[in-house]
């Protein structure tokens, strides 16, 4: 039997639950720990206003570009990004930069399988923070079983949780696509990580970075994935599916090198005026049973 996750309905239900959450019981990214202020400053919070709540994540990949997933442009208008900030909202640290254009990957979901789930945000002015390194095109930065780190301001309990006030990170092992395809229907532009009980990306971590740490500090980190979709949060044997960043390089590199906005799939918001809290999933995913 196949179980399909219907994303739009789920995200709206979770948004409603979030509004009623007890603010005294706020949780953090599932099974993770606080990332010290001033570290991983390429990890970006996407916001509707400069000081408002972060509703999605992303990664600074050039001084004027943030890479995220299409869910983060669909359910809210990404008017601002917070770069170098430790907190889920406010303006007391980092910088808040205006987004002047959002564009989806030109081949996003062309076959209906959710492939190339990427969105690129162009900033009004350059960030003062250093971008994260992009992976090698030959995919040699990803090896099954290696450790990676996911980051964001999302929940640690599911389905009842609320955003973290401080950025969190959690260490996760990468799966081979062959193994992950025994759990989910995925495509070559995906990479899976996690699947250990109690440790995962979760609601409101959507679009956030999955990185490979090479041991020489943040300047040596490599962006290998972006939080996309999954089945629940932190369930044993159920990893999160990430957008595989190496698959986007042919599209991304010409844009960030020429500093031009390339014609792309139009971005349309599903919710006008106010945003909900996106569920982790970026595309309907099918679970194999």
Curated annotation (Swiss-Prot):
Gene3D superfamilies cross-referenced by the UniProt entry: Trypsin-like serine proteases
Keyword Disulfide bond: yes
Ranges where the Peptidase S1 domain occurs: 29-257
Residues in the signal sequence: 1-19
GO cellular component: extracellular region
Keywords: Disulfide bond, Glycoprotein, Secreted, Signal, Virulence
Keyword Glycoprotein appears in the UniProt entry: yes
Cysteine disulfide links: 56-72, 180-192, 202-233
Any GO BP annotation: proteolysis
Protein name, as recorded: Glucanase inhibitor protein 2
Source organism of this protein record: Phytophthora sojae (Soybean stem and root rot agent)
Gene symbol of the encoding locus: GIP2
